Amino acid sequence: MKIKPKMISRFGVYSDPSQSRWLNLFNHVLSLPILFLSSRLANPSCHNLCTINTPPKHFRSLLGLGLKFCPTPSHTTSRAQIESSLSRFRTDFLTKVFFCDKRFDPHNTWTPGQLYLRSSDWSGPQLHAIPPEIHTRVSAFLSTIRPMFHKRRVRRNLTPIQERLLESFSNNPDFLVVPSDKNLGPVLLDRTTYVRRCLDDHLLHPTYERLTSTAANNFTSETTKLLQSFLQAHDQSISAGDTLYLHRYLASVTDPYAYFYALIKVHKSPWQTRPIVSVSGSTLYGLGKWLDRQLQPLIKTLPTYLPSSFTLKQELDKMGGTNFSRMSLFTGDIVAMYPSIQIHDAFEKIASYFTTLDTTIYPPNLINAILSALQLIMTRNCFRFGDTFWLQKDGTAMGTPPAPSFATLYYGIFELELLQSFGSHLHYLRHYIDDQFGIWIHDPDPQVDCQRWLDFKNRQSQFCSLNWVFSSLSSSVHFLDLTIHLEPYQISTSLYEKPLNLHLYIPWNSAHAPHIRKSVITSGIFRILRLITHRSEQQLHLAKFFTRLLARGYNHSFLYSTFQHALNRFATRTNACLPRTSVPELFWPNSPPLHTTDESAFFHLPYHPQDPPSRLLQSAFREHIFHPVSLQKKRIFARTCDPSSYYGAFYNGDEWVRAPPRIVQLRHVEPKLTDLRNLNGQHIPIDRLIVAYHRAPNLKNLLFPRHSEGKCPSATSVSSTLDLPQDDEATDIPSHN
């Protein structure tokens, strides 16, 4: 009797030797849940780059789900979990009610998107600061929500084999599951190969320097002191809200280090690695976010700045009617741009460029704060890799929030000079971080044209010793996610897809909220209709998209209805009956107007497919907070028909008898929440509840967590891979100014 559960636990199926294989297969299919049969994947695949160890059998059944797949938690949301959510809702809701009049304060300096961290000491307004009616409504809402949630065990969306593989791959000493560059699918790699390639390709280069643990701790402590000095020195240059955010963030830091990891470029032959430094939560992350907000408006003024492929498509459509007979397309790519940038030269170029700006927008004290923040962030990038500590000595500090803006600004300043020198040959020039796209105007003399094209490439390669790779001049190029074609009087575009893209969309049975599935489909359809010029190609890509979603377990009826809804929505927004319009308005549909007086209350909740749906929570909000209807008990006495009788009594023939009262319930409609006022006399503008789900950990969180190369105690450490003791032959750096 013990053999059957053991076989099911190990192999996921029990085969009775006394029965035929077809009967065993039939019984196995009957035992499967309907979810696994209706949403079975047709393309479970991944990139296997293992050369040392042999992966376990059926590993593609797990990794083929994609790293965005969320396994269903074994239990529904417990009472303890919902209590924390209810407590947060009470605090957030009462805080919104308390401060709802501040948005009309003329002295309020708050702006949308402003950096903000709530004080750790804030636990909501005091009890007497909120009207009693609001407390009553919130308590009624919480009392209704609380009984809806109770912990119970549920069936997971993984087979026994997949659960065993998930347990095996978590902190495995032999294998690592690594995301691929360009989102081409998960990569299974030998752990030692991954660590060795990270060291050989990046960390052992002169750009980086290894530190001892003592030196790294001293370095991060000194960085904290420098950041505090920065805040004191530039207190008058930074707004009060941003200063408050920076102080609160610095006080909340628990781990001062950033962490290094690499993505696998499987589309390269042989495969390569892309270095990434995750700085979220580190000492300088808050300052980096502030600096990026200062640089973003500046880079948007550069003539060669390109924010996205949608903007590129819009600008190319505006060129319709131009004679392109003497023009060609080209692209350029900088190899390892971030480490190649010479920091001191970049500081000089950017500081010189700041002197040309309007002082009313960028006053000198703000410019000094920006340059000081750049100096601090770009020269203090200290991070961990496994049990080792490293310092980036040169180049752009990878992973920091202002890194893309810094690199874009630095090269955009140089491109201003490039446009002056080669403007007669450049009909169009744009760049997106390290990628460049342009339209070249040919000279009538072929020899002159060839020399000018060569000078253009050499001029860029000589700037900052960047290693450029240019395409040849042609009528068709690949740039970002587009294939751009040069036609006689227009430029058409289509989608470009990497050949090794596995198209692992979120499977149907993933533990995501239902609206996520629809949003993935809708955004994919909108992307096809916005970026593709010709209608025949739109239909071809829509058909491919439909087929790929079927392979991920989606059913036909759901896809048909969602596709039709998305197409109708797109046609409505673009005021077109068919998705063939190529006018610029097609690519920037206007959103429906929002009522500026309406606000939402947010209910943060962990998502579980077996929990009560969001519509029940929103219904409870409407019934108990927004527009409650209460039932009040009232005593009603009998009334006789005798005109001489008095109310509440009747004559039984001998004497007058008082009638017993009858208890009834009467509906009492209370005023809407928007009709109530807080204690400052301001109307409360909250009219709806948004259930903000946060998903369960996905496969990427489980198989490739932060600092994954150092979390397996039985694996070979990074310092051992270096063939060095952990702190030997590492540099002891007391300080870096």
Please describe what each predicted stretch is.
Residues M1-N737:
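Charged structural interfaces that engage phosphate-rich ligands
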